[in-house]
């Protein structure tokens, strides 16, 4: 980055960098615009009980990111995922609702007017108070925003009604740890697991699931899942220690429609464009964030990315802002970088 600016910030024409005091992993964009700009939440990744969530304010006109110190708060263990409530969630207060996963699913109200963060609920479905199976991820249903699904190392997916703070249903989803979950429709979600499968579930028929993909090598874990919100026929997944992004069409199970193989090391994160059905971004250990445009048919030599961005070190996290679709956020080491696309 060519010039530095105040507030732990450096910027160029197309990127803004925020330097955190600690390594970062979880990250989320708010769909609400506040008086100070667009809010971004980032979570620390410290091998310790005491971790933090910081709320940042991003002004795209002035290309500045500022921490909001009054809205920084402690979090038990590193949050495995952060999400702000979808815009479809109607709430009486003007504050933002933020969800985090780790030991439990937690809901927080971020109120910038009063500079407060209020813990709203801690949701735990464990029958024994001494034990909790860590949550690896969760997804907020934007069609039915009272519904939030979590996944855990104990092979289950749990669907919560967050308005009533009760479990709607809990399913044994896989044979091994469940690593990620994504909603497609109001009652349909999918998950990926260390057992190497992508499975789709319908809450109207809980006894059955559809396996739409399995790792080519048995038991190669699948780490992440992204469902294309602009075209629900397509989803993407990544395999452990693999440089591939696998694109699936749920109408033709088992065979990927495309495999994106231009990363030089393992892929860690994927995100579909919020405003286009054809674009997806991936980030990996090769320090690169690649944006792909998916053609109808891949050529004989595969698909090349339409744009390449190099970060300072391995990219651990990536989010594409739905409220500002010109911006992608990536996290690497102790930095959160916003890229204009």
UniProtKB/Swiss-Prot annotation:
Assembly and binders: Interacts directly with GL3 and BHLH2. Part of a complex made of GL1, GL3 or BHLH2, and TTG1. Interacts with CCT8.
Q: Where in the cell is it found?
A: Cytoplasm
Taxonomic classification:
Eukaryota, Viridiplantae, Streptophyta, Embryophyta, Tracheophyta
Give the modified residues of type N-acetylmethionine: 1
Gene3D superfamilies given for it? YVTN repeat-like/Quinoprotein amine dehydrogenase
- Which named protein is this? Protein TRANSPARENT TESTA GLABRA 1
Q: Name one GO biological process term.
A: cell fate commitment
- Give GO terms: molecular function aspect only: DNA binding
Entry's InterPro entries? DCAF7-like, WD40/YVTN_repeat-like_dom_sf, WD40_repeat_CS, WD40_repeat_dom_sf, WD40_rpt
A GO CC term assigned to this protein in UniProt: cytoplasm
- Has UniProt tagged this entry with the keyword Cytoplasm? yes
Keywords from the UniProt entry: Acetylation, Cytoplasm, Developmental protein, Repeat, WD repeat
What SMART domains does this protein's entry cite?
WD40
Record keywords: Acetylation included? yes
Where are WD repeat segments found? 74-118, 130-170, 173-211, 262-302
Q: What does this protein do?
A: May regulate MYC transcription factors. Involved in epidermal cell fate specification such as trichome and root hair development, seed mucilage production, and anthocyanin biosynthesis by acting at the dihydroflavonol-4-reductase (DFR) step. Together with GL1 and GL3, promotes trichome formation. Activates the transcription of GL2.
**Tissue and organ distribution:** Roots, leaves, stems, meristems, flowers and flower buds.
